[in-house]
A protein has these predicted regions:
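N-terminal, positively charged, Ser/Thr/Ala/Gly-biased leader segments
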Residues: 1-11
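Ligand/cofactor pocket segment of small-molecule handling proteins
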Residues: 93-130
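Flexible gly/pro-rich beta->alpha loop and the following alpha-helix that scaffold active-site loops
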Residues: 13-88
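Cofactor-binding loop segments of dinucleotide-utilizing enzymes, especially the Rossmann-like FAD-
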Residues: 2, 27, 92
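A short acidic, often aromatic-flanked loop/helix-cap motif at beta-alpha or helix-coil junctions
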Residues: 30-34, 113-115, 139, 155-156
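Amide-donor transfer/coupling interface in amidating biosynthetic enzymes
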Residues: 42, 106, 120-191
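Glycine-rich His-Gly loop
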Residues: 1-3, 54-59, 136, 168-170
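Short glycine-/acidic-enriched loop or helix-start segments at secondary-structure transitions
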Residues: 8-10, 62-64, 97-100, 142-143, ...
Length: 191
């Protein structure tokens, strides 16, 4: 987890139902939420069955916010990809996976906040939703990636090796939405 707001939610519950033991790490503690330039050492992914990189309220490219630790996360994602460890990147996590593998991330033409539908090339992999969204950025995919879902704002899902990146939030719970709203989210919704 990148912060105290996000949690594995529905994805974590499904993994546990299937017998996986979850190990979660929090990069930015609650008291540093508005000053997230912390030091953090990411674990090596080699012994894991799966890496899930969740959302975050910051932008992957915002050096003042994430510059002190994003390099470590990008290295972890590159190594997981190299080793063939499956990666699920959600929102910020998908943007980090994109960046780690040679793509780029920038501002979206408009934010997406709330429930949206998407167009999917493979509905068995990515149903068309509606999906919950809360983001301001979009990905320009790395060379190896294949876009599998989109809408008029941005790529919504892509595959790359054994990785899957999604811009929406399949893990979302009402508890996390309330946390988003309590931490600057109400102001974002009013814009």
């Amino acid at each position: 987890m990148h912060d105290h707001v996000t949690e594995p939610g529905l994805i974590g519950a499904r993994l546990e139902e299937r017998g996986y033991d979850l190990t979660t790490v929090t990069v930015v503690p609650a008291e540093r939420h508005h000053a997230p330039d912390v030091s953090f050492t990411f674990p090596a992914p080699g012994d894991w069955d799966l890496v899930v990189s969740l959302g975050a309220p910051w932008s992957v490219y915002d050096e003042t916010a994430v510059g002190s630790w994003i390099g470590g996360e990008l290295a972890l994602l590159r190594e997981a990809h190299r080793l063939g460890v499956p990666v699920l990147g959600i929102c910020f996590g998908a943007q980090a996976l994109t960046t780690a593998l040679g793509g780029s991330v920038g501002p979206a033409p408009r934010p997406e906040i709330g429930w949206t539908r998407i167009e999917s090339d493979d509905r068995s992999l990515i149903p068309e939703g509606p999906w919950f969204q809360w983001h301001h950025d979009r990905c320009a995919l790395p060379p190896e990636a294949v876009e599998v879902a989109r809408n008029e704002v941005c790529t919504q899902a892509f595959t790359v090796g054994r990785g899957l990146g999604v811009q929406f939030h399949p893990e979302i719970t009402t508890t996390v939405v309330r946390r988003y709203l309590d931490l600057d989210g109400r102001e974002q919704c009013e814009r």
